[in-house]
Design a protein with these regions (language model features):
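Rossmann-fold NAD(P)-binding glycine/threonine-rich loop
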Residues: 238-256, 268
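Glycine-rich beta-strand-centered segment in the early N-terminal region that forms part
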Residues: 20-36, 49-94, 133-135
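Cysteine-cluster motifs in flexible loop/terminal segments that predominantly coordinate metals
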Residues: 39, 51, 85-130
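A short acidic, Gly/Pro-enriched loop at the edge of an enzyme's catalytic core
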Residues: 27, 201-211
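Mid-domain Rossmann-like dinucleotide-binding core that forms the NAD(H)/NADP(H) cofactor-binding site
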Residues: 136-202
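Glycine-centered, small-residue-biased loops immediately flanking beta-strands
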Residues: 232-233
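C-terminal hydrophobic helical "lid"/dimerization subdomain
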Residues: 2, 267-333
């Protein structure tokens, strides 16, 4: 049986292990992983802070090249450059029936319920695979999932010229700001714990038509309720690890709408990346071998300023060299 290297979580242990190369089942494709992004939720899974399968190959944000297909798969070919929506929809619920599969509440996720992408190969249903535009690098393709998540804010009932606040000091807040600006929201502030603006003083109450809370902690949500205008919206992104208490009395008094959002569409994510490439490049960090996972996970826990990536096939070489190799892997490069 052919084997591959993968970051495998078993119980409380996380190690790079040799595991069997998966074979695509009916309706699936086998993808050779070129680049896989590291998210805080991957670290939480590694630490056992979120429910997930055991044993489990971690990782859910990635791009790569199709290496094999089940006989019934149509529309793809070996060597196609692809990226993947890691949420596997149930295809049985009302959302799925409406075609809004990115919002399926009963999904499974790569790297949590199904084997993930911190590996040389991964199998996924063909219905969540998206061919990458030839202009995108594999690192940008692996960033499609975070962009898709940020696009979820547009599901909220907001529109230009509404005045908004994005709360947060990390890359997810900066990405959400850029997504909103690209859709015409020009009256927009960004402010987060630890920033100079935050230390300079409190925002006056009732300042914004809407606020986006990327860190759903109690103190953050209470502050967002305070600074949004009566009748305004608090848009909640991110997934807290524990239940969050809320100042519901103030929210009721001000008739504030609390709106939780998840994902936009993956097609819109790829379109955004093609159009706004220069506006995300400063959010993308280094590419590392799988064997560096302890350092990468530690850095992600301490700071979420830049997105780090794994390249399963390489160790100890620079990002540019990895990109040069990766772009040769597909005919659309």
């Amino acid at each position: 049986v052919a084997e591959m290297r993968a970051i495998l979580k078993q119980g409380t242990s996380v190690q790079v292990e040799h595991v069997p190369v998966p074979e695509p089942a009916a309706g699936e494709v086998l993808i050779r992983v070129a680049v896989a992004g590291v998210c805080r939720s991957d670290v939480n899974a590694a630490l056992g802070l979120v429910p997930c399968a055991d044993p489990l190959v971690l990782g859910h944000e990635f791009s790569g090249v199709i290496a094999g297909l089940a006989p019934d798969v149509r529309g793809f070919a070996v060597e196609d450059r692809v990226t993947v929506m890691p949420l596997i929809p149930c295809m049985n619920c009302e959302r799925c029936a409406e075609g809004d599969t990115e919002s399926c509440p009963y999904h499974e996720c790569l790297g949590f319920q199904r084997p993930g992408a911190f590996a040389e190969f991964v199998t996924v249903p063909a219905r969540v695979v998206h061919r990458m535009p030839g202009t995108l690098t594999f690192r940008e393709g692996a960033y499609a999932e975070p962009v898709c998540s940020s696009l979820g804010v547009l599901k909220a009932d907001i529109k230009p010229p509404d005045r908004g606040l994005v709360h947060g000091a990390d890359r997810t807040a900066r990405l959400a700001e850029r997504v909103l600006r690209s859709y015409g929201f020009t009256s927009l502030d960004v402010r987060g714990t630890g920033t100079g603006e935050d230390r300079a003083g409190r925002i006056p109450p009732d300042t914004y038509d809407f606020v986006v809370a990327s860190e759903p902690r109690a103190e953050v949500l209470d502050e967002m309720i305070r600074v949004v205008r009566p009748g305004g919206r608090v848009i909640v992104r991110g997934r807290p690890l524990e239940p969050v208490p809320l100042d519901l009395a103030t929210a009721l008094r001000k008739e504030v709408t609390l709106e939780s959002v998840s994902y936009g569409t993956f097609a819109a994510s790829l379109a955004f990346l093609c159009q706004e490439r220069g506006h995300v490049s400063d959010l993308l960090g280094s590419v590392r071998p799988l064997e560096d996972f302890e350092d990468v996970f530690s850095a992600e826990s301490e700071s979420q300023r830049l997105k780090s990536f794994f390249c399963p096939d390489f160790a100890g070489i620079g990002t540019d060299e990895i990109e040069a190799w990766a772009r040769l892997m597909g005919p659309g490069a």
